[in-house]
Amino acid sequence: MIYQGKSLSAQLLEDGIVEFKFDAQGSVNKFDQATFEEYIAVVAAINNCSEAKGVIVTSGKSTFIVGADITEFLVSFSQPEDALASWAKKASDVFDSFEDIQLPTIAAINGIALGGGCEMTLACDYRVAATTASIGLPEVKLGLMPGFGGTVRLPRLIGFDNAATWMSTGKAFKPAAALAQGAIDAVVEPENLQAAAISMLKLAIDGKLDWRAKRQPKLEALKLSPTELIMSSTTCKGMIAAKAGKHYPAPMVMINTLIASANLDRTGAMAAENTGFAKLAKTDAATAQIGLFMADQVIKGKAKKASKLATKAVNKAAVLGAGIMGGGIAYQSAYKGTPIIMKDINDQALDLGLTTATGILTKQVERGRMNAKKMAGVLNNITPSLSYDSVKDVDIVVEAVVENPKVKGMVLAEVEGVIGEDAILTSNTSTISIDLLAQSVKRPQNFCGMHFFNPVNKMPLVEVIRGKDTSDETVAAVVAYAAKMGKSPIVVNDCPGFYVNRVLFPYFAGFSQLVLEGADFTAIDKVMEKQFGWPMGPAYLLDVVGVDTADHCTGVMSSGFPTRMKKIDNDPVSTLYANERLGQKNGKGFYDHIKDKRGRPMKVPAPVAYELLGQHCADKKDFSSEEIIARMMIPMVNEVVRCLEEGVVDTAAEADMGLIYGVGFPPFRGGAIRYLETLGLDNFIAMADKYTDLGEIYHVTDGLREMAKSGKSYFTTDVKLA
């Protein structure tokens, strides 16, 4: 052993081969400050070992290296930009020092090699991957770019265009694809990885492979003519501008860095990377996207903990109500491996549910993501039934019948009489109080809400709603089942609208007030989509949700919060609903939903909608983009703050992820609380105070004012003030 640290070691094997092993004390290998310090020591030990003839880099984990420890490096990100660039240089210098070892080097990639893990392999002369490995540079998903030499080495290995694609998409590549592009040199079965890597390394040691020639291009400028560089850069920039847009700066900064460093040697190119990395790390988008990554880890961590605490395992499920929603729930459960009974009262409904599941699966097969055998296996996990007897042995029931408290209560009471006493009963409801529904069951401790979002197979969020009598064991089991289904569960306490709908409808109220004052709904949509970043503006979103559904939810929210969310007179949503303009579901809402010449769906502003709304709205008035954004977002942010203060949702991280996963809040803004803190609490309060005459939804809470006064952050403070 020539070096032994807590995470890294270097051992001299036979024939002068040094095994440089990453084997951290935790579950995965990642780059943190302690690992960097050991990395420097390993390089020194190898350089001082006179018997060393070559180096193989290995992992003692099932993964290779998952990347950098972003939680630790966030402290460095708080530095000024020039200091951050210096920090990035120190980190990338460590990789350079390894690459400069005057011995052949090879990486034996046994599993995931992402971010810094991928960059570790790029610093080697050769790369051999197991068939189970994956490799990529996903930093763009955090609003960042590679910072350990990825922008320098990858384009010199696989070419400008391929490297631009790798980095701007953040995609992880399977070994075969990486091999075809030249990112790795061989692919072998996992059991042969070590032997294959050592065999290739010996060829390099013996001079049968020219490792110096293999390394040299990574130290020089790219082999591109001026014309080739112009063509490649123009194409890449055009594609990125179209896909990423103005709100996500990382892809364009990466491409500009590649362009700037194309004619530079490693030293110059590294300096360009250090500068670009520091620039991106200081952007609001990076702060937001890193925050989302960490929030997602919070949710996953809670789900993992729930899985360990759950005393009731869910091995068989049932869904009551086989409509589109029931079919989607059945598909998701079956697809992720939990057999499910799909029960309804008539064959037509069962056919609809099966058609929904089959349609989702067929698309998977058509896109090459699933074969026919897998599709058949998933369908075999779904058992349609007209009888309650079929569900008597299930571990969990998801009731998904019509959104009517009387109907739901009746169905819940019926099925509770059939299932086992320790079976869990849940209701997929978007608005009906769980405590109200619990009055229909005899074992309320085994009952909670399980709010899926449509379409179930695409929307990640599930709200697990705790009633006043719901047991911790029930919550843990349902969270574990949702996670098993591949969903991101967030536990919320029962209240009107739960969490997502409760904070969404004040946003819709802001929209309705603007329209009544003369704003054009298409202008509002344009501002909220193009400038704020929502995937759909409020009018379009209402059409997609369903104008009838939105009108119903507005009534629920009005009953629950009669002062703050009282029904708006001549609400545009109610006006359209009264005239049977239900949105996308019947082809007419704020927009007319038609098909273009190629048969693709499209929307056009509906003249009839303008006519109907004009009967109650003020004359047309133009509002500035700033005012539209303020009047739309203040009510939502205020309601999220109230939910945190009341303990409806536990943490700011979960509050933000609920909006990202549930309604498509722009990820580059990081969620409502991240948006609030990016604006600055004092600035938000000053903005909201301008609109207090518009109603209580624009009034900030005393708790928010106290947070601003004390300079606290919602991400580091217990905010349950109510």
From Swiss-Prot:
An example molecular function term from Gene Ontology annotations: 3-hydroxybutyryl-CoA epimerase activity
PROSITE patterns tied to this protein: 3HCDH, ENOYL_COA_HYDRATASE
Chain sites annotated for binding substrate: D296, N501, Y661
One of the GO biological process terms: fatty acid beta-oxidation
Keyword flag Disulfide bond: no
Reaction catalysis annotation: a (3S)-3-hydroxyacyl-CoA + NAD(+) = a 3-oxoacyl-CoA + NADH + H(+); a (3S)-3-hydroxyacyl-CoA = a (2E)-enoyl-CoA + H2O; a 4-saturated-(3S)-3-hydroxyacyl-CoA = a (3E)-enoyl-CoA + H2O; (3S)-3-hydroxybutanoyl-CoA = (3R)-3-hydroxybutanoyl-CoA
Pathway annotation: Lipid metabolism; fatty acid beta-oxidation
Residues where NAD(+) binds: M325, D344, V401, V402, E403, K408, S430, N454
Pfam family, one: ECH_1
GO cellular component, one term: fatty acid beta-oxidation multienzyme complex
Database matches in Gene3D superfamilies: 1.10.1040.50, 2-enoyl-CoA Hydratase, Chain A, domain 1, NAD(P)-binding Rossmann-like Domain
Its biological purpose: Involved in the aerobic and anaerobic degradation of long-chain fatty acids via beta-oxidation cycle. Catalyzes the formation of 3-oxoacyl-CoA from enoyl-CoA via L-3-hydroxyacyl-CoA. It can also use D-3-hydroxyacyl-CoA and cis-3-enoyl-CoA as substrate.
Family: In the N-terminal section; belongs to the enoyl-CoA hydratase/isomerase family. In the C-terminal section; belongs to the 3-hydroxyacyl-CoA dehydrogenase family.
Protein name, UniProt field: Fatty acid oxidation complex subunit alpha
UniProt source species: Colwellia psychrerythraea (strain 34H / ATCC BAA-681)
Name of the encoding gene: fadB
